[in-house]
């Protein structure tokens, strides 16, 4: 099933010159969303993760649905100050500044096999920081899954070459 028709292009959002790829129509379509879960579920069958890690915020939608579907746990990676208790964090650079991501310090104890998911792979800065955070927390990253990849922005090259990456929709 071609999912591309379920992605809405929003020009000049969130700022002029940006073409935002909105997954909202995909989320509203049960057949389309079911296909996303089937394809990402195939990654779970192949890589046998113990946990799904999802990146704030749309990665939570993808990750919790996939984890529920596959009957495995979900771990959120969040912006700073959103998780209670002890956390591990990583600072990373953005195009115009920096940001920070955090994970519960005990979330990946015992070196679980982890599949990282998000809605979008663009420049790869957030994904790369999440990979480093997973490793710092003790997880064994076995793969990455994205609904959309903006290939021209080079995000895939920011990820470890030995980690399989699957994107369901690739825009060049």
From Swiss-Prot:
| Annotated GO MF terms | adenine binding; adenine phosphoribosyltransferase activity; AMP binding
> Record's InterPro entries?
Ade_phspho_trans, PRibTrfase_dom, PRTase-like, UPRTase/APRTase
Q: What is its EC number?
A: 2.4.2.7
Provide the GO biological process annotations: adenine salvage; AMP salvage; purine ribonucleoside salvage
Provide the primary localization: cytoplasm
Identify the NCBIfam families for this entry: apt, PRK02304.1-3, PRK02304.1-5
Please report which protein family the annotation says this sequence is part of: Belongs to the purine/pyrimidine phosphoribosyltransferase family.
Q: What does this protein do?
A: Catalyzes a salvage reaction resulting in the formation of AMP, that is energically less costly than de novo synthesis.
- Listed name of the protein: Adenine phosphoribosyltransferase
The scientific name of the source species is Prochlorococcus marinus (strain MIT 9303)
């Amino acid at each position: 099933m071609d999912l591309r028709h379920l992605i809405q292009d929003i020009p000049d959002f969130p700022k002029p010159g940006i073409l935002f790829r909105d997954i909202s129509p995909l989320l509203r379509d049960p057949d389309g969303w079911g296909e996303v879960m089937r394809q990402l579920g195939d990654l779970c069958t192949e890589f046998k993760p113990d946990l799904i890690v999802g990146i704030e915020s749309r990665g939570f939608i993808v990750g919790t649905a996939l984890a529920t579907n596959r009957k495995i746990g979900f771990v959120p990676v969040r912006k700073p100050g959103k998780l209670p208790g002890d956390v591990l964090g990583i600072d990373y650079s953005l195009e115009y500044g920096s940001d920070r991501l955090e994970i519960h310090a005990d979330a990946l104890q015992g070196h679980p096999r982890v599949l990282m998911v998000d809605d979008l792979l663009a420049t790869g800065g957030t994904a790369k920081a999440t990979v480093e955070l997973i490793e710092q927390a003790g997880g064994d990253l076995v793969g990455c899954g994205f609904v959309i990849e903006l290939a021209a922005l080079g995000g895939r090259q920011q990820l470890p070459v030995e980690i399989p990456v699957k994107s369901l929709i690739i825009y060049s």
